[in-house]
Amino acid sequence: AHDKDSRHRMFNILDVSENINPKKYNLNSDGKLEIEWSEGNHVSHYDISWLRENCYTIKNNEEYKSPYQLWDGSLEKNIHSIYIDHNEIISSEEGLVKWLELLHYKGIAIVYNAPVEKNSAFPVLNRISHTRETFFKTPFEVINIPKPNNSAYTAHALQNHMDLPWFENPPGYQFLHCLVNSAKGGDSSAVDAFAVAEYLKKNDKDTFDTLTKIPLKFRDKDYTQEAHRSFYGTAISLTKDGDYNDVRFSTATMDALDCHPDQMDKVYKSHHKFGKLLHDDKFQIKFR
């Protein structure tokens, strides 16, 4: 029922009725479960290992354990734990795995000893996969320009935020490559938004529920492209297991609140509290 090369299912499950059931079943000589179905004169064979792996009874009875290693401002004292040498990633599989584990479990990694030529980040990025193209083009320079079409292209300090919350599918990972840092300022800050969400979940469930259930509108109005982009999304979105999927937070690109009048007060206060915590030194780290 599957294409031998692509392994995509070739058979149309919609051709089967809702009332199909096994007519006969047994373990065959190869140790596979053999089922003769009540329709279509069809016999299926299942590996026991596949059945065990896809047993929804077992899976959904097991306690889910999040893979994420949430962190707070105390990470700043041990910031070298998220450092990794550029050459280690480029030259070894072990270095690549270490980098991927930092990104997956911690959500952040600082790569040092990187080359400073333009476009020199691509070899290390391509160790993971291809880069995702956006209308900003790839790569794009974050520099101070006259008449900027984005706050990133100004000399103003930026608040903690997630980029492109008005995308239907915001970036999973973003990579910032610092080529020059000789100007005044240039300090960086980072915050584990999942850790802040977890704090609210444990200490202010009403705020947490508001942030996970009531969508906010984000928008981008770019005068250079005659384009208005907008999307509704919750500040915190969850997976089917109740773990964290992503966070949308950006005071610069959040549009006017658009929700039921009865919800307006709690939405405003919940988002305000979330934003305050995302900038609290208890949760964020700073580095240069």
Give a label for each model feature.
Residues 1-91:
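Motif-centric detector for short Cys/His coordination patterns
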Residues 55-57, 61-108, 113-287:
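Active-site environment of non-heme Fe oxygenases that use a 2-His-1-carboxylate facial triad
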